[in-house]
UniProtKB/Swiss-Prot annotation:
Residues binding ATP, per UniProt: 8-16
Catalytic activity: CMP + ATP = CDP + ADP; dCMP + ATP = dCDP + ADP
InterPro entries: Cyt_kin_arch (IPR011892), Cytidylate_kinase_dom (IPR011994), P-loop_NTPase (IPR027417)
Chain's gene name: cmk
Compartments reported by the entry: Cytoplasm
Organism: Pyrobaculum neutrophilum (strain DSM 2338 / JCM 9278 / NBRC 100436 / V24Sta)
Stored Pfam families: Cytidylate_kin2
Entry protein name: Cytidylate kinase
Length: 184
């Protein structure tokens, strides 16, 4: 019943790394970020607009987080999202936090979302602040307190392959020790 939670800053590589970890572990990926983006698109909003909307509509976060917790409790899953580790911690074997400098994250987001660096930088910073305020207000969670994480990884100067390798080395070693057998 392997459960890995990947959280982190916007643009830090959460989804990319979580997807690869899930592939290697041969378990499904539940991405709260993907669910959030799909809901934003359905409502015709960009991410920042939808984050603002979610501030006054807490049922959105609660629904996504309840789904994440349910999947983590069932086991054999990688959950990914800003709050994934806090939501999945009671069930998670490993919780990973990914971070990177604002500039690096903005560059990644500008490429991914095909927008200017300046717009991406503003969006990354605003999304992070909106998340911080919303999660503190909604759940009393300070997303800057990283004490619940088993591994905190700065991806600023790592390739995707290096970040995945470091994450998997840690996960596989932890799971092997915890379950006294080779998992990956």
């Amino acid at each position: 019943m392997v459960v890995v939670a990947v959280s982190g800053q916007p643009g830090s590589g959460k989804t990319t790394i979580a997807r690869e970890v899930a592939r290697v572990l041969k378990v499904p990926l539940v991405s709260s970020g993907t669910i959030f983006r799909e809901l934003a698109a359905k409502m015709g909003m960009d991410l920042v607009e939808f984050h603002r909307y979610a501030e006054t509509n807490p049922e959105i976060d609660k629904m996504i987080d309840a789904l994440t917790a349910e999947k983590a409790k069932a086991g054999d899953v990688v959950v990914e999202g800003h709050l994934a580790a806090w939501v999945a911690r009671p069930y998670a074997d490993v919780c990973i936090y990914l971070k990177a400098s604002s500039e690096v994250r903005a560059k990644r987001v500008s490429i991914r979302d095909k927008k200017s660096f300046e717009e991406a930088l503003r969006e990354v910073r605003e999304r992070e602040e909106l998340n911080r305020k919303r999660y503190l207000s909604l759940y009393g969670i300070d997303i800057h307190n990283l004490t619940i994480f088993d591994l905190v990884l700065d991806t600023s100067y790592l390739s995707i392959n290096d970040a995945v390798r470091i994450s998997l080395d840690y996960i596989c070693t932890t799971l092997e020790i915890k379950y006294s057998k080779k998992i990956c």
